[in-house]
Each structure stands twice: as structure tokens, then as C-alpha cells.
């Protein structure tokens, strides 16, 4: 057995492959008579019996196998699955518990299924194999036929007359240089992995990504559809010329071309819709006809010219004719080098005809390079030979009249032109510009030169029809792949396939309509330049794709075709762009305009595809280089940015915290959502990233496994980030349930704050009256001890949401998006800043960053500071002057002289009641060894009378501040206040937490407690 298109032989495989253990439970296994590697229920295997495994020991470990890397399955057998690390490292009979951060692999998710259904599928007949082509029939012949188009027979002699043999060779070689480089780049891209259907679009999109790939795919499909019209018009021109020679005219020359063209395109549509097998047979027939016409032409150049042919300008090989035709003879509005190049270049654009049917090739990675390069070589040789031979045999101008001969007795003094040397006088038609023959005037010059003219007509028919047919097949194939990727709206309808080969019949009809529209132009010299820029644009992108993939140094760029150069590819891309503007600058602008429009649309929509493109590799490379470069830059206060580590747990459980920090850091600095797992399974990390992306929050997600919350957060504080791009501010939710939760949880919570201070972090604590937990959160596990609510530290976010395994039937749709107070526009409210202690300026900087966002732009910022009644105005002016130097734009400053007054007794009693649970009572009968100090060492969260007395002033200050907040900021949108700091060893953790609680209690607006790391984050200096 052989897998289609990959060349991997599976002769040693049996009809049925085993299934490895899934979720620790292995299916029944053993040797099924085929001698294969099997897994058993006990997790063991028989790799040593009848297996290809390079070991003699029983093991679940599997030897290297093709199935482990393939994305597709072979009909008639189940695909093998590589064992996971969990299956290798855990005995499922002894230990069914998965590690907390365990995530099932794709292979394990595939492992389930009904065995009866699988056996039934195995007995079904395999689907019929569609026809596949090798490199000769599938690529080389197809490319040669597409290159040998209408230009070869009908315009190459005319181009030779205009540009001369010398410049015609330059045009041919320049075109071949561009197509040759593009062929090398195409070969490199096509051999960098298994190629599927879609041709040029597939190659570019999988290399550069959907943004550029989609735009070029659409343009290339359109260019091929227009090329159908170009080749069809060439065929119709020949038919109408033959009709006129025989006195047959339907309407007039232009309308005759239109009628014949539409009929021809309709017939070609029928052949193409019959299937690739019939189309390929037709191409082989056309190829044989063209080869016969070439032989007929070469023989004709050798045969001596008859008087009838001499009258039309053919004199066989003459050195004088070669010399005269070697130099240019520009005529008409198209008479220029780039005018001729624009007309000739479409004849060289057929090099991608083979790549465009990559899905119909036996082995695209072999067929595309070999067939494409051979086609370029042989067609270039044929173009050079024909231009040289036609230029050496036929003069530029001839009348076609037998009466224009010169008798041997007559004088040739009044005769002008090269034909005078051969006793022919075409002077009159040359002077009057009425010559109808010669390579400058007669498009059918190759028929004139040939030994048998009808064979050249047959060659023209074969070349034009084969090229038109190839383009008629290429355009729908490319467009079908583009439709299946769903990058653009309203085009999916055309991607549906029919039959065993999934023929895109709807796309065929669309191509037919486009071709007919351009056939109605009925002017070959008008159609050819239109598509030149589109093909050049495609070639530029192919060359740039190869260069970009090479220059990023991605380990995934490993083309088996080695004969390419990244710098040569870059040169090819630049040449294509330059030539686009030299040919038709306005058409080049239109082409680039269309590309950039489609590029912008794709960037805006952000299609959910991941193809491992070189753009992704380049993004990584650039980010890595920038990160390394930042290590050489010293920190400066002017460049300070709050880079936030947000203890959200699963981000979907605390949307308010995510929204507030996301608003602070969006397009400004780093945001990282931290998640500590202490018990139970963790949700898949990709799910959280998807949720963040759908909420349009620019944040990273980082989950760690730890024995407890504090050690996990410590891991995040020390290990999060990269180089200088690492968090410097810790944000977390307030622990509302500290009074009813275990005292150890409160101690760990405050310990996290101290750990952050020790690591030089700024710290922010957010308290929202409604709590930070979403009302109906999706599946998630809460980090113990973060957030308010009567729940215990090990509860889940909501009883209706329990995390399940990925292998269950639960839908993997993205989590719902709960709303939060920070998602709404805040209107004309106020942001109240209580700048009571100087922490370096972080308390001022965060509200300033908020006011730069649209949601908060309408809010007025008020700054409250402490002061004395008798110096109130002086202190206000001092603070205003300082804030003005910071250039923050805050103009409303209020001095609060009453914050030093004693609080109300009722509030003091309420505070004491909140800490009574944690107080140590002094017993006079206790031994000194077991006194409060000894008990506090064992339980450091407990509060002694000495602690209360020592910290009484600070406690009363927090109670009084809450009363001030109730008076001044009841209607604010947000309150930002400097966080008090309790000294370790002096202020017990529960007392510190009680301060934070009483300071922010019973406030309707959200409260953000902020404490910087006591270093400047604001400066009024310019250096």
C-alpha cells in the first residue's frame, strides 16, 4: 500500500492498527495476527514480538511511525496514536489521578469511539481513487502548453519586427530570468512539506499567511480567468482570418471574433467540467499537435521560398535579412521596449499551471520542481529559436502582390527596402504604409514560413486552446481552495466540490462568466497588458515568500529542493515590482491597491487559521531580537510602564479585574493573567487565551502548579516575563471572605503582598461592591483565597459549571462573555485619587492612563491630599504645582484637613468586632513559656493586645479615612487610594487585612488600593 502523494510505503502495515491507552485506560490489545505493536489493558505492550520496534523489552513506548506525524488517515485501518507522557509515566491500574496541569493530547482525544462502528467502516469499500498525474503529464506538458500560447504563433514574429532579434532575445531572457527565479522559489516552497490543492494560493498562504495569501489567491484566480479570454481571443483571431481568406464573414471582423470566442469558451467549459482525466487527455493531444507544427515550421524555413511566399516577404535564410531585423524598428503607439515586454510577458506566465493543480499530482514535491524548471528551459529555447529563424527569413514589409517583382533588365535605383536585393519592389506600400504582409504587418507569418500552413493553424489552435483550457482549470482550482479557507465573505458558495475529484463546478461557471466578459473586448493587445501586472504581482509574492521564509531562520523551513538562493528570490521580487510600474504604472497601482485592500480586510477580520507561516516565524524572531536588545538598555523613569501581573485565576472568572487592567495596559504595556492551581485539573490554557482574545483584551496567560496559593504566586512573581519585559506591578482582588475563611488563608493573602514588596513590585488591590466573581461564570476553578464571596477557598465559580475533560461531550465553544462595570462608558463621573502617601507616583499614574481611554475620557479627576486647616491653600498650591510639572492634566486638588480627626465610636467598635476572632487573650495563670508571644509564633496571624495598642493610631486612621471616602466619593466612578503598609513582625497579617477591609468597606464605587515600590515612576525632567 502507498499513501497518495507522499511516497511512503506501508507494505508492512496490516488492515487494522491498535489504539493506545486513553485517559489511562488502554483498550484490549495484543497481536491480531498481523504482528504489530499493540497496547493492552495493563498498559504494557508486545513491542518485542513481531514488531519493528528497536527494543527487546515490553513497553508502552512506541517506535517511530508515519501515523504519528500524519494529519490524514489511510482507508481501511485506524490511525495509530503516540502514547502521551501521562501514559508512559503513570500506571493506570495504580494511579488514576492526572496531574493538575494535565492536558490531553490530540491523539488521546482521537482515541475514543465505538468499536462496532469502526469495524463497520473498515468493511466498507474504499472511495474510488481520483486520477493523479506525474511530473511529465501533470506539470511539464501542462506548463509548456500554457507558455506556448497565442503570443508564440501570433505575436512573436511581430515583436521580433518591432524590437529586432537582439532586443527580442533580451525580452525573452528577461522574462525567463523572472520566471526562472520564480520557478526556483516555487520549487523551494513546494518541497517544504506536503502540498495540497490550491496551487499558487496554497503556496503563498501557507508561507506568508492568510493576509497576503488570500489577496494574491483572489488576484491570481482572476488573472487566470482573464487569461482564458486572452488565449481564446487569439484562437478566434486565427479562425476569423481563415474565414476571411475563404470569403466567409458573419457580421464584421470584431464581432466575428466575439462570436467565435464565446462559442470556444463554452466548448472548453464542457471539457473542463467533464473532469481532470478528460482535460489531461486533451492536453496531451494538443501537445502532440504543437510539436508537429514546430517540426513543420522548421522544415518550412529550410525549403526554398516560392514566388507566392516571396511576394509576402519570405526569402528563406538570408544574412542580410537577419542583420536588418537584428536592430529595432519601432512603430505605432506600442513601439517601445516595455510595450513589447508587456505584450510578450503573459506568454511566459504559464509556469504555475502545474502547481495550480497540486491536489491532482501524485507527488507534488517532486513533480512541481522538476516539471516547472524543465518547462521553463525548453520553452525559452523554443522562443529564442523561433524569433531568430523568423527574423532571418522574413522581411518587415511586403505587399503580397506578384506584380511587384523587378525584372533583370529594369533598374533598382528607385527601389527602396531590403527586398530589392532579391528582385522585389515593395517601395510603394512601404512609403504609403499599406503593406499587408511581412512580419511587421502579418500576424500569420509562421503559417507563411511553414512547409504546410494548415499544420501551423492546427498548432495555433492547439496552443491557444490548451493554454485557455489550462487557465480555465487553474482559476477554479485556486479559487476553490480560497473559498474553503473562508477568508472572505460571500465566496464559500463557489467552493463546493462535486464527484470523486471534488470538481468546483460552481467556480468553473464563475470563471466562464469572467472569461466571456473579457472575450467581448476582442482585442488581444488590450487584454494582454491587463493580466501582466496581476501575474507579476503574484510572482513577486512567491519570490518574497521564499526570501522571507529563508531570512527568518525558522527551523520549520527545510525545503528538500536546495537549488535556490534567498537573495536571488529577493532580486526576483524587486524586479517584478519594478517591471510592473515600467509596464503600466496605473495598472500596477490598481493591482497593489487591490492587494492592500484585501490585506487590510484580512488583518481586520483576523481569520481563525494557523498555518505556521513565515510571518509568524518573523514575529517571533523580531520579538526575540527586541527583547534581547532591551537588555542593553538601562531603565529610565521616562520609559516606565506599569507591567501588570494580574492574579485572576481563570480570566473568565474575574472579568471586572481583567477589564480594568486591560484598559490600563492596552497598546501600552504588558498584562499577564496569573493562575495558580493547587488541586484538581486545570482548564486547557488555549481556552483562556481564546476567551481573552474574544474579549479583545491584550493579555498573556500563565498558569502554574503549586502546593499552595502563596508559593504559586511567588513562582509567578519571580518567573513571569522575559528579560525587561516582565511584570513590575501585582494586581489582585480583595479577599472579602477573610472574616469567615480560615486564618491561614488570610495569612497567605497578606504574605503575597509582602512577597511582592520584597521583590520590588508595586501592588494594587481592587475591591468591587458586587464582588469580582462573575455572576454566572463559565467552567473554571478558582484560585483559593483571591476573591470575595461566602464560598470556601476550594469552591468552584458556580455550581452549574464544573470543569470536564476535553474528551467529554461538553461543547468546546468559547466561554460566554459576562459584562462588568469597567466595560461601560463611565460618563461624566469623577475619578477620585486619595494621594495620602508618596509611593513614587504610581497612585497618580494609573488614573492618568485610564483617562486616556474613551471609556474614561469624560471623567473628571480629583486629587485629595491630607493637610492642615491653617495651611490649606498653601498646601493646595504646592500639590497643584507638583502635578503641573508632571504634565498629567489634573487641575482639581482638594486638601482634607479633617482626616486627622478621631473616627466615630460605632465604626471603631465595628472594626474591633471584625478582629476579635483573631485576638489572643492574655491569661494571668499561663506559664511564661506558653504565653501570647509563644502562641503568636505558632500562629502568626493572631493579634495580641500589644499589637492592637502599638498599631492603634494606624487603625483609627483607616477607620477615619473610610468615613471621609463615604462623604466625598460616594458618586465617583472609581476611587484610587494609597494602600497602607503593615510592617512584618509588627503588624499581624489579619490586622493588616482588617485595615484594607475597613478602608474600602461599604463604598459603592470600585476601590483600587495602590502602593508603588517607593521609586519614582513620574518625573518632570527631560533627561
Swiss-Prot record:
Homodimer; adopts a domain-swap conformation at the scissor helices connecting the transmembrane domain and C-terminal domain. One of its GO terms (cellular component) is apical plasma membrane. It is a multi-pass membrane protein. Expressed in urinary bladder, intestine, ovary, skeletal muscle, eye, brain, and kidney. Keywords: ATP-binding, Cell membrane, Chloride, Disulfide bond, Glycoprotein, Ion transport, Membrane, Metal-binding, Nucleotide-binding, Sodium, Sodium transport, Symport, Transmembrane, Transmembrane helix, Transport. Disulfide bonds join 415-420, 429-435. Glycans are attached at residues 403, 414, 432. It comes from the Eukaryota. It catalyses: chloride(out) + Na(+)(out) = chloride(in) + Na(+)(in). The keyword ATP-binding applies. The chain crosses the membrane at residues 135-164, 165-186, 218-240, 253-277, 278-300, 336-357, 369-390, 453-476, 507-521, 527-543, 567-586, 587-598. Chloride binds at residues 350-352, 539. The keyword Glycoprotein applies. Residues 1-134, 187-217, 358-368, 477-506, 544-566, 599-1023 are cytoplasmic. Residues 241-252, 301-335, 391-452, 522-526 are extracellular. InterPro entries: AA-permease/SLC12A_dom (IPR004841), AA_permease_N (IPR013612), SLC12_C (IPR018491), SLC12A3 (IPR002948), SLC12A_fam (IPR004842). Gene3D superfamilies: Amino acid/polyamine transporter I (1.20.1740.10). Electroneutral sodium and chloride ion cotransporter, with a coupling ratio 1 Na(+):1 Cl(-). Mediates sodium and chloride reabsorption. It is found in: Cell membrane. The gene is slc12a3. Inhibited by thiazide-type diuretics including polythiazide, metolazone, cyclothiazide, hydrochlorothiazide and chlorthalidone. Thiazide drugs, specifically inhibit SLC12A3/NCC transporter activity by competing with chloride for binding. This is Solute carrier family 12 member 3. Residues 614-629 are annotated as: Scissor helix.
Amino acid at each position: 500500500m502507498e499513501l497518495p502523494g507522499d511516497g511512503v510505503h506501508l507494505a508492512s502495515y496490516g488492515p487494522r492498527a491498535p489504539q493506545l491507552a486513553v485517559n489511562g485506560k488502554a483498550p484490549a490489545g495484543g497481536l491480531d495476527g498481523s504482528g504489530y505493536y499493540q497496547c493492552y489493558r495493563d498498559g504494557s505492550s508486545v513491542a518485542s514480538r513481531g514488531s519493528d520496534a528497536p527494543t527487546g523489552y515490553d513497553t508502552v513506548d512506541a517506535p517511530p511511525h508515519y501515523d504519528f506525524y500524519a494529519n490524514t488517515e489511510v482507508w481501511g485501518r485506524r490511525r495509530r496514536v503516540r502514547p502521551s507522557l501521562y501514559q508512559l509515566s503513570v500506571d493506570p491500574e495504580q494511579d488514576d489521578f492526572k496531574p493538575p496541569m494535565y492536558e490531553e493530547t490530540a491523539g488521546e482525544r482521537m482515541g475514543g469511539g465505538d468499536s462496532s462502528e469502526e469495524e463497520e467502516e473498515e468493511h466498507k469499500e474504499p472511495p474510488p481513487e481520483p486520477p493523479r498525474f506525474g511530473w511529465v503529464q501533470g506539470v511539464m506538458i501542462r506548463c509548456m502548453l500554457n507558455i506556448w500560447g497565442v503570443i508564440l504563433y501570433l505575436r512573436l514574429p511581430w515583436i521580433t519586427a518591432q524590437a529586432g532579434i537582439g532586443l527580442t532575445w533580451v525580452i525573452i531572457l528577461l522574462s525567463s530570468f523572472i520566471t526562472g527565479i520564480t520557478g526556483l522559489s516555487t520549487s523551494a516552497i513546494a518541497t517544504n512539506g506536503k502540498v495540497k490543492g490550491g496551487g499558487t494560493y496554497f503556496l503563498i498562504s501557507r508561507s506568508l499567511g492568510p493576509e497576503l495569501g488570500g489577496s494574491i489567491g483572489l488576484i491570481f484566480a482572476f488573472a487566470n480567468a482573464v487569461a482564458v479570454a486572452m488565449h481564446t481571443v487569439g484562437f478566434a483571431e486565427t479562425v476569423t482570418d481563415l474565414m476571411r481568406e475563404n470569403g466567409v464573414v458573419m457580421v464584421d471582423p470584431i464581432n466575428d471574433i466575439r462570436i467565435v470566442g464565446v462559442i470556444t469558451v463554452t466548448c472548453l467549459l464542457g471539457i473542463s467540467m467533464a473532469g481532470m482525466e478528460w482535460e489531461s487527455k486533451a492536453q496531451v493531444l494538443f501537445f502532440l499537435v504543437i510539436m508537429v507544427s514546430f517540426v513543420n515550421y522548421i522544415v518550412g524555413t529550410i525549403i526554398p521560398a516560392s514566388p507566392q511566399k516571396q511576394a509576402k516577404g519570405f526569402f528563406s535564410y538570408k544574412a542580410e535579412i537577419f542583420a536588418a531585423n537584428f536592430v529595432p524598428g519601432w512603430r505605432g503607439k506600442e513601439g517601445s521596449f516595455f510595450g513589447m515586454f508587456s505584450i510578450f510577458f503573459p506568454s511566459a506566465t504559464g509556469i504555475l499551471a502545474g502547481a495550480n493543480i497540486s491536489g491532482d499530482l501524485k507527488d507534488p514535491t517532486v513533480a512541481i520542481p522538476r516539471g516547472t524548471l524543465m518547462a521553463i528551459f525548453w520553452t525559452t529555447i523554443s522562443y529564442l529559436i523561433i524569433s531568430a529563424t523568423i527574423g532571418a527569413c522574413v522581411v518587415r514589409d511586403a505587399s503580397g502582390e506578384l506584380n511587384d517583382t523587378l525584372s533583370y533588365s529594369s533598374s533598382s535605383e528607385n527601389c527602396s527596402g531590403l527586398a530589392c536585393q532579391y528582385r522585389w519592389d515593395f517601395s510603394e506600400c512601404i512609403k504609403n504604409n499599406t503593406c499587408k504582409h511581412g512580419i511587421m504587418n502579418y500576424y500569420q507569418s509562421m503559417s507563411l514560413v511553414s512547409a504546410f500552413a494548415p499544420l501551423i493553424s492546427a498548432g495555433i489552435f492547439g496552443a491557444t486552446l490548451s493554454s485557455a483550457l489550462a487557465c480555465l482549470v487553474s482559476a477554479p482550482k485556486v479559487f476553490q481552495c480560497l473559498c474553503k479557507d473562508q477568508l472572505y465573505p460571500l465566496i464559500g458558495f463557489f467552493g463546493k466540490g462535486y464527484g470523486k475529484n471534488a470538481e468546483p463546478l460552481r467556480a468553473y461557471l464563475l470563471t466562464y462568466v469572467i472569461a466571456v466578459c473579457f472575450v467581448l473586448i476582442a482585442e488581444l493587445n488590450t487584454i494582454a497588458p491587463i493580466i501582466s501586472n496581476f501575474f507579476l504581482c503574484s510572482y513577486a509574492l512567491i519570490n518574497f515568500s521564499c526570501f522571507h521564509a529563508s531570512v527568518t531562520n525558522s527551523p520549520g523551513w527545510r525545503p528538500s529542493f536546495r537549488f535556490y538562493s534567498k537573495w536571488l528570490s529577493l532580486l526576483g521580487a524587486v524586479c517584478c515590482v519594478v517591471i510592473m510600474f515600467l509596464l503600466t504604472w496605473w495598472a500596477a497601482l490598481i493591482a497593489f491597491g487591490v492587494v492592500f485592500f484585501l490585506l487590510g480586510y484580512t488583518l481586520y477580520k483576523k481569520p481563525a487559521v494557523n498555518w505556521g507561516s513565515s510571518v509568524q516565524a518573523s514575529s517571533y524572531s523580531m520579538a526575540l531580537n527586541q527583547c534581547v536588545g532591551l537588555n542593553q538598555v538601562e531603565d529610565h523613569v521616562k520609559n516606565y510602564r506599569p507591567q501588570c501581573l494580574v492574579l485572576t485565576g481563570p480570566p473568565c472568572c474575574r472579568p471586572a479585574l481583567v477589564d480594568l487592567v486591560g484598559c490600563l495596559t492596552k497598546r501600552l504595556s504588558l498584562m499577564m493573567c496569573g493562575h495558580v492551581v493547587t488541586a484538581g485539573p486545570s482548564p486547557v490554557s488555549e481556552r483562556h487565551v481564546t476567551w481573552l482574545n474574544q474579549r479583545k483584551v491584550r493579555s498573556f496567560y500563565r498558569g502554574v502548579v503549586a502546593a499552595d496559593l502563596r508559593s504559586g504566586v511567588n513562582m509567578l512573581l519571580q518567573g513571569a516575563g522575559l528579560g525587561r519585559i516582565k511584570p513590575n506591578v501585582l494586581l489582585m482582588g480583595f479577599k472579602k471572605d477573610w472574616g469567615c475563611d480560615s486564618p491561614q488563608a488570610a495569612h497567605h493573602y497578606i504574605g503575597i503582598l509582602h512577597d511582592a514588596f520584597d521583590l520590588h513590585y508595586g501592588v494594587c488591590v481592587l475591591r468591587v461592591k458586587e464582588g469580582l466573581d462573575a455572576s454566572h461564570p463559565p467552567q473554571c476553578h478558582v484560585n483559593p483565597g483571591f476573591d470575595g464571596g461566602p464560598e470556601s477557598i476550594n469552591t468552584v465559580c458556580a455550581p452549574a459549571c464544573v470543569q470536564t475533560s476535553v474528551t467529554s461531550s461538553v461543547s468546546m465553544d468559547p466561554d460566554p462573555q459576562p459584562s462588568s462595570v469597567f466595560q461601560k462608558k463611565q460618563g461624566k463621573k469623577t475619578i477620585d485619587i486619595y494621594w495620602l502617601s508618596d509611593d513614587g507616583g504610581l497612585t497618580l499614574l494609573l488614573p492618568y492612563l485610564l483617562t486616556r481611554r474613551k471609556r474614561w475620557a469624560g471623567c473628571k479627576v480629583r486629587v485629595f491630599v491630607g493637610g492642615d486647616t491653617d495651611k490649606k491653600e498653601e498646601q493646595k498650591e504646592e500639590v497643584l504645582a507638583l502635578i503641573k510639572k508632571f504634565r498629567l492634566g489634573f487641575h482639581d486638588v482638594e486638601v482634607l484637613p479633617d482626616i486627622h480627626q478621631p473616627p466615630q465610636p460605632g465604626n471603631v467598635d465595628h472594626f474591633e468586632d471584625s478582629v476579635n476572632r483573631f485576638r489572643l487573650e492574655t491569661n494571668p495563670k499561663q506559664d511564661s513559656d506558653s504565653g501570647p508571644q509563644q502562641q503568636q509564633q505558632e500562629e502568626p496571624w493572631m493579634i495580641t493586645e500589644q499589637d492592637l495598642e502599638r498599631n492603634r493610631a494606624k487603625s483609627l486612621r483607616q477607620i477615619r479615612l473610610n468615613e471621609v471616602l463615604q462623604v466625598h466619593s460616594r458618586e465617583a466612578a472609581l476611587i484610587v487610594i494609597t494602600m497602607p503598609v503593615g510592617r512584618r513582625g509588627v503588624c499581624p497579617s489579619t490586622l493588616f487585612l482588617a485595615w484594607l477591609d475597613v478602608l474600602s468597606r461599604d463604598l459603592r464605587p470600585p476601590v483600587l488600593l495602590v502602593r508603588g515600590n517607593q521609586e519614582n515612576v513620574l518625573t518632570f525632567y527631560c533627561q
